[in-house]
Structures are given as structure tokens and as C-alpha cells.
UniProtKB/Swiss-Prot annotation:
The keyword Acetylation applies. Coiled coil: none annotated. Its main location: cytoplasm. This is TIP41-like protein. GO terms for cellular component: cytosol. It holds the Pfam family TIP41. The gene is Tiprl. GO terms for biological process: DNA damage checkpoint signaling; TOR signaling. Disulfide bonds: none annotated. Interacts with PPP2CA. Interacts with PPP2CB, PPP4C and PPP6C. Interacts with IGBP1; the interaction is dependent on PPP2CA. Associates with a protein phosphatase 2A PP2A(C):IGBP1 complex. Interacts with PPP4C and PPP4R2. May be a allosteric regulator of serine/threonine-protein phosphatase 2A (PP2A). Inhibits catalytic activity of the PP2A(D) core complex in vitro. The PP2A(C):TIPRL complex does not show phosphatase activity. May play a role in the regulation of ATM/ATR signaling pathway controlling DNA replication and repair. The modification N6-acetyllysine is found at K106. Residues 173-271 are annotated as: Interaction with PPP2CA.
Amino acid sequence: MMIHGFQSSHQDFSFGPWKLTASKTHIMKSADVEKLADELHMPSLPEMMFGDNVLRIQHGSGFGIEFNATDALRCVNNYQGMLKVACAEEWQESRTEGEHSKEVIKPYDWTYTTDYKGTLLGESLKLKVVPTTDHIDTEKLKAREQIKFFEEVLLFEDELHDHGVSSLSVKIRVMPSSFFLLLRFFLRIDGVLIRMNDTRLYHEADKTYMLREYTSRESKIANLMHVPPSLFTEPNEISQYLPIKEAVCEKLVFPERIDPNPVDSESAPSE
């Protein structure tokens, strides 16, 4: 399932007052990976860590939301909910650096499961997160509309020492009057479990908010005996068989006072 051939690219697309940016480049260098692992208090990071990859949606006034691997890993819970499976010990041993290393490996989620929903951007102006009962209109998304812009960005991927896959990717498509984004964490531990955490983001040009839906699905492989195993590697196909464990609907409401003459988004703050 690994995706190879990393050709760096930087794509910008304007959608009204919004600038959409998709940056893709090579995996992080080992020294940078070690430094980040220390910062995150994790003994190791995913085999393929794209620390500089990002998908950003930013208003000319500076506020917005972006999706990156580092912030996603900050949401990994290293202290509870650990999966105890047959391959865990073997996998951890394979990640211990050097045969003389006697350090006690701190508990951490070696599946890199994250409930990351994006990083809010802006200083004085920021999107306001408000719970809602509104849902993204999936029928609208099925309508045949011209795709003005499409991009997919891989944030991290790991084959769990050949015991499955853990990956995080984000893709966006822009139609004439709206855009739709899907951030997907997908975990498959062969013979054990499949888990999928999806964050969907939808904005229509005439609205003063975005809708954000987060769903977490999960099933033990033992409960999927009625499903063809060939679907286990296809997130889009297997999702319908995974029970929903959690669902959160939110509005990302725009600031009330937006600069009527926003600066060129090239110079808008991105932190």
C-alpha cells in the first residue's frame, strides 16, 4: 500500500477569498525524525513521515485551517487504549535501536491512531468551533459538478513491521461554488482489527462557516468474516462494514469582523 515516487510539488488555487495550498515533498531526514520523535515523546515515528507536506485552506484575512503530519501525531494517545496484539512485542523489538540499548521503551500507541481534525490558523482572527446538528449534504456532493481543482497529500504511512498499515492522508476537491475535503486515518492490523477515522470538511461559497464532520469506525477482523478479505485493503469499500464508534459534527464559523480588504494571501500569516 506504500506510495512511492516522491516528486516535490507546490500547488496553489484561489477560491474567492480563500487560498488553497497543497505542498508535497520527500520524507523527513532521519536526523529530523529523531528530533521530532524526542519532542513528541515517542520512541519512533512512522516509517514514511512527510513532515513538510501540508494541505492548507487560508482566508485572505489570515484565518483558516491546515492539515499536517506533526500536529496529527500530537493527537496520538500514548498512555491509554493501547492495542495488545501478538505482533506488538516483536514490532517494538524491531524498532529498538542497537542491540546494546537497554532503555525501557515508554508506552506509546505504535499504531499511530490519531483523532486529528486539522490545525486552526490565525492570530487575532480564527475560526470558531461550534457544535451543530447540521450534517454535510452528501446528495449535493454526488451532483455532477466540474472539478476545478483536486489534490491529495500523504502525511504519513507505516507498514507496522509487515503486520498491516497505518496511514494518514488528506485530499480536497473544489467545485464552482464549494469545496470538500477528506482527511482519513486508516489502520489495518492483519488478522486483528480495522479502524478508520475520517474528518470531512465542506464549505459553500455563500456560507459564513464550514461544516466539519468527524467519524471513527472500527471492527475486529473476527467480526468481518462475512466480508471478502480483498476489501480489507480498500478503505472506501470496507468503511460501510465498520460500526461507527464516535461521531462529532461542528461548524467552523468565520470571524464576525473580516478585513474587507484582506492582504494578498501570499503574505498572510500561516502560523
